[in-house]
A protein has these predicted regions:
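Secondary-structure boundary elements
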Residues: 134-137, 145-187, 333-399, 461
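Sec-dependent N-terminal signal peptides
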Residues: 4-13
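Sec/Tat signal peptide C-region and signal peptidase I cleavage site
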Residues: 15-19
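Sec/Tat-exported extracytoplasmic proteins
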Residues: 35, 39, 43-46, 50, ...
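Long, contiguous, compositionally biased segments that the model treats as domain-scale units
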Residues: 29-32, 36-210, 214
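Extended, non-transmembrane interaction/recognition domains
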Residues: 192, 198, 202, 206-357
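Hydrophobic/aromatic-rich core segments of domains that either
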Residues: 218-247, 357-360, 407-486
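Active-site neighborhood of thiol-dependent amide/isopeptide-bond enzymes
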Residues: 194-207, 380-440
Length: 486
């Protein structure tokens, strides 16, 4: 009898709990639905107000000429003379540039819910990579006119939920392809031109709209001919791009204009954030493998075959030179902190590790890597090759036939951090860039004491020099230290 009573009580208790659970889930679903509705209402309200301002808030702003990228008179490489050895000495420095702290990417002001309505699929290409987005059924986006009213109406049309799938698909591509902010902006440009036509006002406002809805700071302007132009705000100072001074800072112009300025709608969007030029992770473009290149050190200790993704190089061609704040030497950290792609690591690193197995210590491994970078690559000035200064990402040095001191130092710093797990800093002298490595055991040679750590100079452009040797004529010059991430 007691057992029967226990069973009945248990059943009743289970039924009660089950009913409570159902009620909770029902209430939660209703709450979730209401919250989503509130989000959508908020976003539509914001876009409606934004469009209303677009009908009236356009003012003339004069263009600010581009800041030219720094031109450093780089010193030529020097051949090491064993007979000119000197006592180890500290490197004098007067500034330490801190390591970067990349922030999370911007996000929409409200979740973008998938629209279950009818749609059509559009495909496009960006950096050799296929993209696919959903557009409204029978998509035909046109701006009826070239004035403030027409542009505001176009913004209102885009902000209907018919275009929510497009925004979602673009954000999914950003996530799946691990696109940095600049790559995402370029992708949106390719998408917009594919569906609206190259150089059209429709393509410009579509790119601006999706970038804005993704959480980024944008401004729209138009020329004297009423052609739309997109302006973007950056965390960093960008060289070689003209800009416009808005209420919250400088915005950069991506498309050329013949006029001395633009009529700009300087209206902010809630929670908007500037784009960043940090590349925190590999950009996963479709792979287009380059021709094989052999890279052999002069003493034959290290010999490898190298191939890179040409689609990635195509993206790097678009990447603008920039600096953090107003510190011109910070620009090299942007390149040195960018990781090598997985495919390059899978091909190159096993070969390098196999060669370094013969080394008797970590210090000797670093020395062999140094000699490889010193002698396997051909030195040439950027002015002669590119007609302007151009720093390389590590992959570019592995691909292009020539490189200079900054490219070698960027590559060497990447290899030492990845293969040997050691901390590396960049050392900038006037006209020259080198590296310094923090070994776990004391190493003889020129050094930098920094934050309680001992860094030994390793110069990839001092040809034939072992670790610990500073290139001649650098000794008495004040250096700047650039801290790097892992």
């Amino acid at each position: 009898m007691k057992q029967l009573l226990l069973v009945v009580v248990s059943i009743l208790a289970f039924s009660t709990v089950h009913a409570q659970t159902d009620e909770f889930l029902k209430n939660y679903d209703e709450f979730k639905q209401q919250a989503q509705t509130n989000y959508e209402d908020f976003r539509q309200k914001v876009n409606k107000e934004y469009a209303d301002w677009m009908r009236q808030a356009w003012e003339w702003h004069r263009k600010i000429e581009p800041k030219p990228r720094p031109k450093d008179d780089m010193l030529p490489p020097v051949i090491y003379n064993k007979e000119q050895q000197s006592e180890p000495k500290p490197v004098i420095y007067d500034e330490v540039v801190p390591a970067p702290e990349p922030q999370p990417q911007p996000k929409p002001i409200a979740p973008i819910r998938e629209n279950k309505g009818d749609f059509q699929v559009a495909t496009f290409q960006f950096f050799g990579t296929k993209g696919q987005v959903r557009l409204p059924k029978n998509f035909s986006f046109r701006i009826n006119g070239k004035d403030e009213e027409a542009y505001a109406t176009a913004w209102e049309n885009l902000s209907s939920n018919q275009y929510d799938n497009l925004i979602r698909d673009c954000l999914v591509l950003r996530m799946e392809r691990q696109l940095c902010d600049w790559a995402y902006l370029m992708m949106l440009g390719a998408m917009s031109e594919a569906v609206c036509g190259k150089g059209t006002n429709e393509a410009t406002i579509l790119q601006a709209y999706v970038f804005c809805q993704s959480g980024y700071k944008i401004r729209l302007g138009f020329t004297n001919n009423k052609d739309l132009r997109l302006l973007v705000k950056s965390e960093h100072v960008i060289y070689d791009l003209p800009g416009f001074r808005m209420n919250d800072g400088l915005y950069y112009l991506l498309q050329p204009i013949n006029d001395g300025g633009l009529h700009i709608c300087d209206i902010s969007f809630p929670e908007e954030k500037p784009l960043s030029l940090w590349i925190a992770q590999e950009q996963k473009f479709a792979n287009q493998t380059s021709k094989e290149r052999q890279l052999i050190s002069e003493n034959k200790q290290v010999a490898v075959k190298s191939q890179v993704n040409e689609n990635l190089l195509q993206f790097y061609d678009t990447y603008p030179t920039s600096m953090v704040g107003e510190n011109i030497v910070s620009r090299w950290a942007m390149y040195a902190n960018t990781p090598l792609s997985e495919k390059v690591r899978e091909q190159l690193y096993p070969q390098l590790k196999a060669a370094l197995k013969e080394a008797k210590s970590v210090e000797e491994s670093a020395d062999w890597l140094l000699h490889w970078v010193q002698t396997a690559f051909v030195y040439e000035y950027d002015d002669k090759v590119w007609e302007h200064d151009r720093a390389f990402f590590a992959e570019e040095t592995l691909y292009y036939p020539y490189c200079d001191c900054e490219d070698r130092s960027i590559l060497y710093s990447r290899l030492v951090r990845d293969l040997l797990g050691l901390e590396v800093i960049l050392v900038f002298y006037p006209g020259h860039l080198a590296t310094a490595v923090s070994f776990k055991t004391p190493v003889n040679g020129d050094y930098i004491n920094l934050n309680g750590k001992h860094f030994t100079i390793c110069d990839p452009t001092y040809i034939g020099a072992p670790i610990g040797m500073t290139m001649p004529d650098m000794d008495n010059k004040t250096a700047k230290i650039i801290l790097l991430g892992k």
